[in-house]
Amino acid sequence: MTLTNQYGAPDAFVRAMEDDSYSKGDADFSVTGLLQPPQIARLRAEHEDKLSADVRDRVWMLLGTSVHNTLEKYGDGIVEQRLFGECEGVTISGAIDLDKDGHLTDYKVTSVYTVQKALKPDWEAQLNMYAWLLEQNGREAKSLTIVAICRDWMQSRAGKNNYPESMIVPISVPLWHSERRDRFVRQRVEVHTKEATLPCTKEERWSRGTYGVENEKGKLKTFDTLGDATAFINKQKTGRYYVRDVPGRYIRCESWCDVSQFCSQWQAEEKSNG
């Protein structure tokens, strides 16, 4: 991937982003790689030499790296340890930010909005895949925690309307049982190693307003996820409700996917929408 600097960021930013020391080690997939949509991962691999990103759009990665590099110096336990495991003949690796006697912690630089919403499924899955890796290495995970650092936190809003009291927010993550972890890892390996590439799901595309809940009178209310739509239906005391697909937006495809120009799924939709 080529790094561009269309908006004139200082050279120090460019050099910092070019100095990418990340490696998944001697593994076929990393934990974060397996959590990516398989279509995006495959298109990135196929078109790597054609991809580019601008410094402006990668500052958030620099912030995250800086926080990790600082905190790993002071962790009370095993820090940034890369573990390896095998599943279906595939080698998987993952770097755990902090392991203190089986209590795993992962740091996330994120937004207040993200913290205020329900726990992100990808975060829950990532921490449980780390627990799986720990088990593959003969150790037991006892608890999982995400420590969110809210980059846009404002003290003037602290404690109001579910606004976090601090910029630093520990989030407890449910620890799945061993069988569920095994099953999930196998499923992710399967979707990434299939000969035919699977299209991205609505959730993977960050859909907005694509799930419609309609009542018997034809009144429609839209939701971003199937879970939100189902939760709304479950709260209704009377009447019949139906979930159906409705036109909406796909934020990732529109603005955040670096392979959208190579994606037949997105290009076909763009063409059909005129």
Where are the regions that the model predicts?
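Metal-dependent nuclease catalytic regions and adjoining charged, substrate-binding loops involved
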Residues: T2-G8, E88, L133-G274
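Metal-dependent nuclease catalytic cores that hydrolyze phosphodiester bonds in DNA/RNA
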Residues: M1-L104, S111-A125, E135, A148, ...
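Short, charged, low-complexity patches
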Residues: K120-W123, L127, S178, D182
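Active-site-adjacent bridging/hinge elements
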Residues: L104-D106, F232-I233
